[in-house]
Swiss-Prot record:
GO cellular component: extracellular region
Family: Belongs to the AKH/HRTH/RPCH family.
UniProt cross-references to InterPro entries, sorted A to Z: Adipokinetic_hormone_CS
Residues with PTM Pyrrolidone carboxylic acid: Q1
Protein name: Adipokinetic hormone
UniProt key word Secreted: yes
Subcellular location: Secreted
UniProt keyword Nucleotide-binding present: no
Organism: Mantophasma kudubergense
Keyword terms, alphabetized: Amidation, Flight, Hormone, Neuropeptide, Pyrrolidone carboxylic acid, Secreted
Disulfide bonds: none
Reported function: This hormone, released from cells in the corpora cardiaca, causes release of diglycerides from the fat body and stimulation of muscles to use these diglycerides as an energy source during energy-demanding processes.
Length: 8
């Protein structure tokens, strides 16, 4: 599982 959270 890959969780990508940009700080946008």
């Amino acid at each position: 599982q890959v969780n990508f959270s940009p700080g946008w």
